[in-house]
């Protein structure tokens, strides 16, 4: 049937899968993967391509009888018993982030007017996938203090930025660079001179940055 709207055959598509994806949840990624129209990200699926109906065989037995199946019209293959193997294999819990990374990498290359913004969010996504950076107490404590109208505190091993009445957790991306989950266009970089923290650099996703000296 006719579907109203603009065709967009070149827009990248991603399917997220797990080993619990089964039957109908496998059909679409299988079909689009076979057509090379989408990227499957996650885990190999459960492998249920053959439909069945239940039949009472005797007064003691009830059987499942296969009555339909889906297959690739070219190869005649299906995913029964083997599942749909992902193009990018990662644990299911990481599939969405991994798909974000793939999409952002393509956007950063294709849309040069927004490369800076896409690379910003790409760095954020990659930092979420990497093992958490652990900073020692002395390093964390050295970052606390007053920075203009803002303040950094240390509570239970975590740094918090207090700004305009908000208390925002600072998540480390490196030894000095922190992202703010609640404000994804803001990062905080601690500036050191000869090992001493002298300022906070507020970086914004669009490329701007502001240096705020630390109070003595």
Positions of predicted regions on the chain:
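Loop/turn-rich, solvent-exposed surfaces of beta-rich toroidal or solenoidal domains
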Residues: 4, 148-151, 155
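Short acidic-hydrophobic surface loop/beta-edge motif
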Residues: 53-58, 147, 178-180
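Short polybasic amphipathic segments
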Residues: 70-71, 158-162, 179, 198-202
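Short, surface-exposed beta-strand/loop "edge" segments at domain boundaries and coil↔beta transitions
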Residues: 71-74, 166-170, 184-190, 204-212
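Calycin-type beta-barrel ligand-binding domains and close structural analogs
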Residues: 156-160, 203-216
């Amino acid at each position: 049937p006719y579907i109203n709207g603009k065709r967009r055959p070149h827009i990248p598509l991603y399917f997220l899968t797990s080993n619990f994806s089964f039957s109908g949840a496998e059909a679409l990624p299988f079909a689009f993967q076979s057509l090379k129209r989408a990227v499957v990200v996650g885990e190999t699926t459960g492998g249920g391509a053959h439909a069945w109906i239940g039949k009472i065989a005797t007064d003691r037995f009830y059987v499942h009888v296969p009555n339909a199946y889906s297959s690739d019209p070219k190869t005649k293959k299906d995913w029964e018993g083997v599942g749909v193997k992902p193009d990018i294999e990662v644990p299911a819990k990481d599939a969405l982030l991994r798909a974000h990374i793939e999409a952002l990498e393509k956007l950063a290359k294709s849309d040069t007017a927004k490369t800076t913004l896409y690379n910003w969010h790409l760095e954020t996504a990659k930092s979420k996938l990497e093992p958490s950076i652990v900073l020692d107490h002395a390093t964390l404590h050295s970052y606390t203090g007053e920075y203009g109208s803002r303040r950094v505190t240390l509570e239970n091993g975590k740094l918090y930025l207090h700004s305009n009445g908000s208390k925002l957790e600072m998540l480390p991306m490196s030894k000095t660079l922190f992202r703010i989950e609640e404000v994804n266009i803001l990062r905080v970089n601690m500036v050191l001179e000869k090992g001493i923290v002298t300022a906070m650099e507020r970086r914004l996703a669009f490329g701007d940055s502001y240096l705020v000296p630390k109070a003595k």
